[in-house]
Every structure is written in C-alpha cells, then in structure tokens.
Amino acid sequence: MTSTASLEIPDVSEYLEALNPHPAAYLTPGWTVEHANSEFERIFKGLWISPNFLNWHYVGRRTPDIVLDWQSSSDWLISWLKLNLALSPDDPDLTYVLNKMSPITDFTRHWEQNTIPADPASRPWTVRDLDNDSVLQIDMRVWRAGQSSDLMLLGVIRGTVDA
C-alpha cells in the first residue's frame, strides 16, 4: 500500500458537508482529522484540541459525557487499527500514532485484549448529543480512501434512544 506521507490530502469539505445531518470526517492513517463536517464537529466536542480521534476517545475530557458505550466503541477502534496495521504495516502515520498511544493505559489494555472481529465495518455507537440533550444511535463505519491509507469515517444516525 502507498503511504499518504507524500500525497496531497484532497479537499473533501464540500462532500463531507453534504452528508449532514450525519457526522463524517476524513482522517489520516493516524486518525488525525483532516476535514470534518459541521455535525461531526458538533457531536464530538473537544476533538479540535486533541491530536487525533484516538487520543480524544481515550483521554478527551468530554469523551465520557459524549460516548456512552465506551467499551464497545473502544473495541471497534482497536479492531480498525489492527486491520489497518495488517493492511499497511509500514505506514509512518499509523506506526507513529500507535507509538504515541502506547503509554495510555486504557488504550494499551484494550490493544492487548482485543482481536479483530469477523466484520469490524460497522458498529453502533451510543452518543449523547450535548446540544440537544438527547442520546443518538449512530452506526459508525470506516472506508479506506482508495489505495492510500487515509480513511473516511461516517456515522449514520439511526435514531434516538431514551436518555
């Protein structure tokens, strides 16, 4: 697989924005958010201050208030990381983020316990919408961007559940 280190990241802002009201983002192999639509930024508050989505998920101050099924979403993230590592073991962005995340106890514990499920493609997340005081069921899905190691993360809002 080709690393994206030397490739220019395409401007997908308009495409991502057209996916509203569903949260969507374009990520590097190291899960750094390069572009995100307004719904993604609104739901995943505090993400802009984190170096990447993984860091936000494991140590973000607001994450426990937003991601209500943290264990399940953590398993999903780890599964995707392991799958991407199997597909692109030499990707510098991916190996860099794994090295940066390894000192984080929760991340390391989940990394050591997790195995890749039969289909890590979609996993429902239960997410609190802090702006509207509601709880959303979001099917999270990741696609690799062509032959690069970049990713598109799309959450399809399936409905609300009782808070």
Each predicted region: which residue ranges?
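Short, charged amphipathic alpha-helical "coupling" segments at sensory-output junctions
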Residues: 1-11
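PAS-family sensory domains
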Residues: 14-16, 20-22, 27-120, 128, 156-160
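Short amphipathic alpha-helical surface micro-motifs
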Residues: 7-8, 37, 106-108, 133-139
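Low-complexity, glycine/alanine/valine/leucine- and proline-rich hydrophobic stretches
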Residues: 115-163
